[in-house]
C-alpha cells in the first residue's frame, strides 16, 4: 500500500517539522526527505542559515498559491545551497494538494530557493474526473476533491512538504492586497524558519 504522507497531519519518524514565522502568523509544515532529499536538504539548510529571514512572499494569487523564498523579491533571484540550479524530485507519493509546500521553477531542473504554498481551495469537478482517468491514485483524487489543490502542477513542481498547522495564516497571506505582478502592497515577511528535527 502506497503511503501518501500528505493525507495525515502526524509527523512521522522520517519527516522533519519546520515552523515558518511570518508577520501574518505562523505556519507549521512537515517535510519529506525520503521523497525529495535534495530539495528538503536545500530548504532546511537555508532555513537554519537564516537565508529566508526577512524574505517576502513576492507573488500572491488568492485561490491559487503564495510564493516566496527569493531574497531579491523579484521572482528572478534566489540560489540553492548547491551553487547552481538542481534537479526536480518528482514522486508518485506527493502532490500539489491544498497546503502543499512546492518548489517554484523556471522549467525542468531549475530549482533554487523559491517555493510556493498551494492555496487553491477547490478543484473543478470536470478536472477531478480527468485526474481519475489520467492515472492519479484514488486517495489523491479524493483529497483533491475534499481539500482542493493544483493538480496540473503535479510532476512539474517538486512537492517536498505539507502544511499541518496555520491554515488561517496561509489564508491571511493569500487575501493580502496585491499590486502589479501579484506583489503584495504591504510586505508579507518571513521572519524566520525554525527546524525541529
Swiss-Prot record:
Pfam families recorded: Pro_isomerase (PF00160)
Annotated EC: 5.2.1.8
Presence of the UniProt keyword Isomerase in the record: yes
Highest taxon in the source lineage: Bacteria
An individual GO BP term: protein folding
GO molecular function: peptidyl-prolyl cis-trans isomerase activity
Domain PPIase cyclophilin-type residue range list: 14-195
Annotated catalysed reactions: [protein]-peptidylproline (omega=180) = [protein]-peptidylproline (omega=0)
Root EC class: isomerase
Keywords: Isomerase, Rotamase
Task of the protein: PPIases accelerate the folding of proteins. It catalyzes the cis-trans isomerization of proline imidic peptide bonds in oligopeptides.
Family note: Belongs to the cyclophilin-type PPIase family.
The protein, known as: Putative peptidyl-prolyl cis-trans isomerase
Lineage: Bacteria, Bacillati, Bacillota, Bacilli, Bacillales
Amino acid at each position: 500500500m502506497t503511503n501518501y504522507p500528505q493525507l495525515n497531519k502526524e509527523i512521522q519518524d522520517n519527516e522533519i517539522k519546520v515552523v515558518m514565522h511570518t508577520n501574518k502568523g505562523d505556519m507549521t509544515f512537515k517535510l519529506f526527505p525520503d521523497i525529495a532529499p535534495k530539495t528538503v536538504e536545500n530548504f532546511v539548510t537555508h532555513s537554519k542559515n537564516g537565508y529566508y529571514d526577512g524574505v517576502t512572499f513576492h507573488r500572491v494569487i488568492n485561490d491559487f498559491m503564495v510564493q516566496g523564498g527569493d531574497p531579491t523579491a523579484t521572482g528572478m533571484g534566489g540560489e540553492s545551497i548547491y551553487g547552481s540550479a538542481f534537479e526536480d524530485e518528482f514522486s508518485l507519493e506527493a502532490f500539489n494538494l491544498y497546503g502543499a509546500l512546492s518548489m517554484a521553477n523556471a522549467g525542468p531542473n531549475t530549482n533554487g530557493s523559491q517555493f510556493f504554498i498551494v492555496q487553491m481551495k477547490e478543484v473543478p469537478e470536470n478536472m477531478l474526473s480527468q485526474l481519475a482517468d489520467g492515472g492519479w491514485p484514488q486517495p489523491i483524487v479524493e483529497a483533491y476533491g475534499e481539500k482542493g489543490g493544483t493538480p496540473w502542477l503535479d510532476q512539474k513542481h517538486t512537492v517536498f512538504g505539507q502544511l499541518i498547522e496555520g491554515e488561517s495564516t496561509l489564508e491571511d497571506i493569500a487575501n493580502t492586497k496585491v499590486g502589479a505582478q501579484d506583489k503584495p502592497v504591504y510586505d508579507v515577511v518571513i521572519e524566520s524558519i525554525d527546524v525541529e528535527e
